[in-house]
């Protein structure tokens, strides 16, 4: 695909920005187009009412290419880092479909203000029996807060709130390979944790692309299954970058109890459930041992499926002496 005049005008300005604010960005148009060819988003997002939300949009190159391929009615760049905002101010004035919402993407209220008060983004509501075909989210979560935010986004998918209140909204998210590796850790692999289980519960997630230097960090079965685009390790591309495609799915699990049990069990994930069940609360052993399948009790938490966790959570929900549920959220004031 040839470079448009808009992209040609953006590239030199974007490449002059020498800070990434702790994030990593793929800025090679050839690689970005190769990834978008694999995703084939054009075959699904055909509506003239399409809206795109770009979270931590950064140096604009991917955003321009995505915009020109999908031609959305509105493309909101949620970004408040100074050098990137200055880039948008210098380049977007002749491209009305692309607007910068200059507020902090890390703050929950930013998204409420964007959709409810300022109405910069106004997605349609769609039923939860298909992937939303008029709303797409892209995000770059490669900074130090990235994995924490990724977990929060998964919770929002599972809880059907935040941007996911509009329906099952596909997300394209850049993350470090360390986070991606956890997402695709198979049963009985010690990389499995709460992130893995939450992803399996609420989404169908695919590995779309990963850096050449990161390939060996994934199990061969994962690479064979997804056949990701391999980003070459050269001076044009970061060496620790993975892109995942998150396709939310509906579920009927009681997430409060499930999440509490998952968090607790993963603290001692290398011990059999029957040996560490007291971590759910004082007296748990007396309640759970006779009510759970003996086969399940002998498993270690990293060997469990999200449905097996749900079996434990259902017994937990009936426990008269269960502790109060404490839900962890990210700290908006964290540095």
Swiss-Prot record:
Please provide one cellular component term from the Gene Ontology annotations of this protein: mitochondrial DNA-directed RNA polymerase complex
Query: Where is S-adenosyl-L-methionine annotated to bind?
Result: 79
Task: Give a yes or no for keyword Transmembrane helix in this entry.
Answer: no
Q: Which UniProt keywords apply?
A: DNA-binding, Methyltransferase, Mitochondrion, RNA-binding, S-adenosyl-L-methionine, Transcription, Transcription regulation, Transferase
Q: Where in the cell is it found?
A: Mitochondrion
Q: What class of enzyme is it?
A: transferase
Q: Which Gene3D superfamilies match?
A: Ribosomal RNA adenine dimethylase-like, domain 2, Vaccinia Virus protein VP39
A single GO molecular-function term is: DNA binding
Instruction: Kindly report the protein's main subcellular placement as a broad class.
Output: mitochondrion
For this chain, the family text in UniProt reads:
Belongs to the class I-like SAM-binding methyltransferase superfamily. rRNA adenine N(6)-methyltransferase family.
**Function statement:** Mitochondrial transcription factor that confers selective promoter recognition on the core subunit of the yeast mitochondrial RNA polymerase. Interacts with DNA in a non-specific manner.
Specify the protein name.
Mitochondrial transcription factor 1
Q: Which organism is it from?
A: Kluyveromyces lactis (strain ATCC 8585 / CBS 2359 / DSM 70799 / NBRC 1267 / NRRL Y-1140 / WM37) (Yeast)
């Amino acid at each position: 695909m040839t470079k448009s005049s808009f992209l040609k005008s953006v590239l030199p300005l974007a490449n002059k920005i020498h800070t990434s604010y702790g994030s990593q960005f793929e800025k090679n148009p050839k690689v970005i187009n190769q990834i978008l060819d694999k995703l084939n988003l054009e075959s699904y997002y055909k509506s003239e009412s399409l809206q795109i939300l770009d979270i931590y949009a950064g140096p604009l190159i991917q955003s321009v290419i995505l915009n020109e391929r999908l031609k959305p009615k509105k493309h909101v760049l949620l970004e408040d880092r100074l050098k990137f905002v200055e880039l948008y101010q210098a380049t977007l004035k002749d491209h009305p479909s692309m607007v910068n919402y200059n507020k902090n993407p890390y703050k929950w209220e930013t998204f409420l203000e964007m959709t409810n008060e300022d109405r910069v983004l106004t997605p349609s509501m769609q039923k939860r029996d298909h992937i939303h075909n008029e709303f797409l989210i892209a995000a770059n979560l490669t900074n130090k807060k990235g994995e924490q935010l990724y977990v929060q986004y998964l919770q929002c998918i599972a809880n059907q709130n935040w941007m996911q209140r509009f329906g099952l909204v596909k997300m394209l998210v850049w993350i470090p390979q360390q986070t991606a590796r956890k997402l695709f850790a198979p049963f009985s692999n010690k990389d499995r944790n709460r992130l893995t289980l939450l992803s399996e519960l609420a989404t169908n997630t695919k590995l779309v692309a990963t850096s050449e230097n990161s390939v060996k960090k994934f199990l061969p079965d994962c690479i064979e299954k997804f056949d990701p685009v391999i980003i070459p390790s050269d001076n044009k591309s970061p060496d620790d970058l993975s892109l995942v495609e998150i396709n939310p799915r509906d579920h009927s699990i009681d997430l409060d109890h499930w999440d509490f049990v998952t968090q607790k069990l993963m603290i001692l994930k290398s011990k059999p459930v029957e040996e560490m069940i007291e971590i759910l609360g004082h007296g748990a052993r007396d309640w759970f041992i006779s009510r759970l399948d003996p086969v399940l009790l002998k498993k270690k938490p990293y060997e469990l499926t999200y449905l097996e966790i749900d079996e434990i959570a259902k017994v937990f929900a009936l426990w008269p002496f269960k502790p109060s549920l404490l839900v962890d959220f990210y700290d908006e004031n964290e540095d």
